[in-house]
Structure formats: structure tokens, C-alpha cells
Amino acid sequence: MTRKLFATLVLVAGVMLMARVQAQPPGSPHETAKATVGGATISVEYGRPYMRGRKIMGSLVPYGQVWRTGADAATTLTTSKALAIGGATVPAGKVTLYTLPAEAGWKLIINKQTGQWGTEYDQAQDLARVDLTKKALSAPVDQLTIAIEPAGDGGVLKISWESTELSVPFTVK
């Protein structure tokens, strides 16, 4: 009798645990922004966190600390041809993108190390740090969005979230 009771309790606990796990809100979805620019195929893979009622700039994304520029794994940029991003040369292949937030001006960090979790930043692997142009948005962006906007033999890489848009021009070499 006690074995049947124990088995029933284990079964009920298991069902309740599964229901609780399934009821949790989804984490940050992952996205790939893609474009063909000047004969180069360019993509940015990143996690897209939501605001979920939180203050983002200066709080969830603190000023003065390197940020993974997304959620979960580090954000990566892959290009089939070399690029000039904000004056820095980025070779064909894959690099990791971090940002250094500041109230006045942000930096885009282009890092040679790839495949790491977003918080595993190694400054010794930096390829370059370039200035980002910061613009206030009139309407908030609820979910982090990265876009590649082609223009001639180059374009603009844009990062938008909350009421902030960051951008940097690039050209295909």
C-alpha cells in the first residue's frame, strides 16, 4: 500500500513540475539580421531580449560596463568580404560584437574571439573599438533589434532598444 501511495505522489509531483516548467514565459528569442551589400553577405546573430517593463539603458545595460549586445551567447557578425566599420578593418569571417555603453557616447567592440557565452569577454582579443552614433527615438522599441541597412557599397549597422538607436557606417573592401 505504501509503495502505491509513494508512486502516486511521485507521479503527481512530476506532472505538477512539468506544468510549472511549461508555464514559464519564453526566454529571449534568437534572430539573424542578414543583408547582401557590395557583393558581401553579412549577417549578425543575436539574442533579442524584451524590455518587459524594465529600465534598460543605464540599468539592465549599465553604463561603463562591456555588454554582450543581446542575450545569451555573444552576438556575432559574419561577413564574406572584409569590411571597414567606423574606420576599423574587419577581415572576412566571424567576429563577436560587444558594446561599451555610456550616457554620452557608446563604443562598438569588435572582438576576434568567437563561440563564447556573452559574458566571457576577453579585451586582449579586441580587433577594434569604434564610436557609435547615439540617437533618441520618439517611440520605444520593446525588443532589441539589430539591422543591416545597405547603401551603395556599404551601409549602416543599427542597434535599437528602449528609446535609443545606435549606428555605425560600414563599407565593403
Regions found by a protein language model. Give the residues of each.
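Bacterial N-terminal signal peptides
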Residues: 7-16
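Targeting-peptide/extracellular-domain and disordered-appendage signature
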Residues: 2, 19-91, 96-173
